[in-house]
């Protein structure tokens, strides 16, 4: 039995039929069923294997397209960090192959030919849960190289689990007039319900727009009617599996894009780029990695905070309850952090809304102990921002900047309809 064979697997009480797929575990057989879903089966539970049809082995070679640049279209670089948003499927075997040469991308999503001149490049090949701060820096440096070589827009293909962290990091580290669009897919390209193609079409379209800044592009609803463009410091993954999992928080989306007509509708004021500085880019990639994000809960022990301080951590984001509170029993740990010159800042677990530590005595006392309110910043954004500030500024300057807007992470006021 080889990859690509169509087989019938008989278990104790059921039977599975499908195409044999590559498996990461030698004790498991993975098959792709006709429904499009993959199933992994423990070899020890299989009573009988019947090969119904010998299949072709996965073939990834493609004939060169010999594409010529269209002088009327912008030059867009698509950088891959991993994930399945721009993968190509061998439908004979069901195997999924990363598609990141220009030819591969056009083969996978031919609609891109009408939108831009495409260049593809792999900078990482990891699951996004394995993303590290040093990889954010690598991504920023790859963006700089592409822009200096003539890219007029950047699309970053990224796994969805931590895409909002990366978007936040790039928002702080990268200063450029070129639009930088992160895009992912909730459903892989080998599934009938995949959102990959429409997302990447819309992301490339967004990258051709005369805007600047870092954004996340994903489905705007569960169907295929519209994609939303979200600002990189005001977006969060709010559902584990829905195609419209990413939402702007405390703001409306920046724009919506029809993936079929390519129409772009801006929902807020546009950040116009300065075309005279299109090849200029400044990076500030120093990050202090000794920063922690701690969720406050009933009964939380001060020893947790003391542990991080004793381990040499320089900054702590507390995700507090309500308007930004902790139990009084946690005050001892906060005092300990303050005595050791560790910056402590506060966000809220509610996600929507704003920290206001002036309303109740608990919040006022926390402020008196040096805890900095993070306004309406998302916890993940505050975490990344603190890494950035402590990596580039002295602690007193970092304290002052923590509650000030740097990259669109803080709203002066919140529209209740957001």
Swiss-Prot record:
NCBIfam families: asnASE_I (TIGR00519), gatD_arch (TIGR02153), PRK04183.1 (NF003217). Heterodimer of GatD and GatE. The active site is at 84, 160, 161, 237. This is Glutamyl-tRNA(Gln) amidotransferase subunit D. It is an enzyme of class 6 (ligase). Belongs to the asparaginase 1 family. GatD subfamily. One of its GO terms (biological process) is translation. It comes from Methanococcus maripaludis (strain C7 / ATCC BAA-1331). GO terms for molecular function: asparaginase activity; ATP binding; glutaminyl-tRNA synthase (glutamine-hydrolyzing) activity. Allows the formation of correctly charged Gln-tRNA(Gln) through the transamidation of misacylated Glu-tRNA(Gln) in organisms which lack glutaminyl-tRNA synthetase. The reaction takes place in the presence of glutamine and ATP through an activated gamma-phospho-Glu-tRNA(Gln). The GatDE system is specific for glutamate and does not act on aspartate. Residues 74-405 form the Asparaginase/glutaminase domain.
